[in-house]
């Protein structure tokens, strides 16, 4: 099981997450309490192992701005967390992830229409797109087509207490956590380590 730790804002947390076994680190460039500057993201990315994916999260941003930030920071993927459509996705020259809030089984059909490398299934959006710490009914994704499952990233309220059930139900390619590894709004290294270990153990 691949694991992405999202909403990273400092070098130490990013490096520790990688040492614990994180496969991807997420940087939020959209409005959020975890928003990061281009300069800081570039500094952190420059100190991470080459094999770790560096993913930038954007919400309804222009293709030009996304591409500029991706190029300057050294992102390997961009995550589109707003209302982006295929005509915008096609203009990107970097691998992409499209986020989709899940409210019914029909969202799986909607997901298959996106021309992206991965689909991230999340809880429905609220004030901020993602990072709300709320789960959705994983059973809605239980009967996912095999080809879609191979490119599925599961997010939305995941934590050390529910990750086993989430993985068992959805069987995604990757799991994505942010608020679930925080204490009082800040990333907690102990929780990050526990989450990564549990995710990889329960998917064996």
Curated annotation (Swiss-Prot):
Protein name: N-(5'-phosphoribosyl)anthranilate isomerase
GO molecular function: phosphoribosylanthranilate isomerase activity
Catalysed reaction, written as an equation: N-(5-phospho-beta-D-ribosyl)anthranilate = 1-(2-carboxyphenylamino)-1-deoxy-D-ribulose 5-phosphate
Alphabetized SUPFAM superfamilies for the sequence: Ribulose-phoshate binding barrel
This enzyme's EC code(s): 5.3.1.24
Domain of life: Bacteria
InterPro entries in UniProt: Aldolase_TIM, PRAI_dom, RibuloseP-bd_barrel, TrpF_fam
Keyword Zinc (UniProt): no
Entry keyword Isomerase: yes
Assigned keywords, A-Z: Amino-acid biosynthesis, Aromatic amino acid biosynthesis, Isomerase, Tryptophan biosynthesis
Matches recorded under NCBIfam families: PRK01222.1-3 (NF002297)
Pathway: Amino-acid biosynthesis; L-tryptophan biosynthesis; L-tryptophan from chorismate: step 3/5
Pfam families xref list: PRAI (PF00697)
GO process terms (BP): L-tryptophan biosynthetic process
Family listed: Belongs to the TrpF family.
């Amino acid at each position: 099981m691949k694991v992405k730790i999202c909403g990273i804002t400092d070098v130490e947390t990013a490096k520790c997450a990688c040492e614990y076994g994180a496969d991807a680190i997420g940087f939020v460039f959209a409005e959020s309490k975890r928003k990061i500057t281009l300069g800081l993201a570039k500094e952190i990315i420059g100190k991470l192992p080459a094999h770790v994916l560096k993913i930038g999260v954007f919400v309804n941003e222009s293709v030009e701005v996304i591409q500029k930030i991706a190029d300057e920071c050294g992102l390997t993927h961009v995550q589109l967390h707003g209302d982006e459509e295929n005509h915008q996705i096609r203009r990107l020259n970097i691998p992409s992830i499209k986020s989709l809030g899940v409210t019914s089984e029909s969202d799986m059909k909607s997901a298959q229409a996106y021309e992206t490398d991965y689909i991230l299934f999340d809880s429905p959006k609220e004030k901020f797109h993602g990072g709300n710490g709320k789960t959705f009914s994983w059973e809605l994704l239980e009967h996912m087509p095999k080809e879609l499952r191979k490119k599925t990233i599961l997010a939305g309220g995941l934590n050390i207490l529910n990750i086993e059930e989430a993985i068992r139900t959805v069987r995604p390619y990757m799991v994505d956590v942010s608020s679930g590894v925080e204490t009082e709004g800040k990333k907690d290294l102990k929780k990050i380590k526990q989450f990564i270990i549990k995710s990889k153990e329960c998917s064996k």
